[in-house]
Amino acid sequence: SSQNILSVASNLIANNQNRVGKTLKTTMEEGELVKLNCFKNGKDEAIGISDEIEKKLKKKYSLNNISILVRAIFQTREFEERFLKIGLPYRILGGIKFYERAEIKDCVAYLRLIHQDKDDLAFDRIVNNPKRSIGESTIKQIHEFSKKNSLSLELASKKLIELNLIKPKTKIGLNSFLNFVAKWRNDLIVKKINHIKLLQNVLDESGYSAMLKNKKDLENENRLENIKELLSAMKEFDNLESFLEHVALATSIDQDWEGEKVNLMTMHGSKGLEFDVVFLPGWEEGLFPHQKSIEEKGQNGLEEERRLAYVGLTRAKKIAFVSFALNRFFQGNWIDSIASRFVDELPEKNLEKNTFFVNEDKNEEDFEFNQDFEEQNETRSPGWIRYQKRIK
């Protein structure tokens, strides 16, 4: 890494109590200042970072040598959406693309079946997910009956129950599933509840949320965070139909080409790797340092998070961007956020501070650069107010 990047990283990690103080030196030149960027919200952060990547491309940087490092895997969604929109190829290193993650496909399958009772692929995926004592032999029986009578799998299941052709134990689970699907469809069509509340009902009433919460491990915690991020994504659409169309489009775009790609990964997964340009988004309290880490491990947890920040910064050989947003969209609601305590630990002399805001009065995405917040007449959210106090 350049000397500026190492100076920032050294200053940060020096705040750990259980560390012998040392100053890192490099054979590389001083290099560019570390960029500290403040955005209005998470969507603007994704736009700003993608714009910066485009600028680096024009300067002949390789996409393979550009990386975005996030604290938690659910954070990739906003960047994936943006990259798909502008046609910027990307890869998830050490992970799976957002809409291809198992729990996201499960949620989408529930919504697809509620929306369209003839969606046999969706039915197949969720009929026994979570487990409802519906075995492979019963599923095979439903498929054969469906094919023979030219019925959808859902209608075939109903008919088999009517004809008393399903085993008693299996019948209870299958009947319960079909009744829930009918209830959720009624919620959507008759009660006209919105698509976000619909998915929340599905997750609670199907037992899917309980299934993930009952097995407390990192994988299931990540799955729950991904589902929360899905609920946030759904808020961007007016109704269920437009959301499902978006998912169909996002999953049909072929990104598996052999050319260069931007790297998206977690900080944990970046250990041992280096890139010319590194973006470190989401440096906000609760997200990074992660609230759970501090709650469970106290000071040790905080120091682990700080070491992770150190790892993230030192993955950059030439240029490092640290950024945070003043507002985040979380489970369908705007929440105010504030810059991570780690931001305060970065040495001023090695930083270039910028505030960015998309100009919403114009059609194109345009940035107001380094303007004072007062001039931009932004919404005075609690996050905005706290940030003002910090910079004055």
What name fits each language-model region?
Residues K349-K392:
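Acidic, low-complexity intrinsically disordered tails
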Residues S1-P89, R112-Q116, D187-K192:
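Helicase P-loop NTPase motor core
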Residues C38, A72, I96, P130-K131, ...:
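Structured beta->alpha junctions
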Residues S62, T76-L88, R101, V108-K349:
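Conserved helicase C-terminal RecA-like lobe
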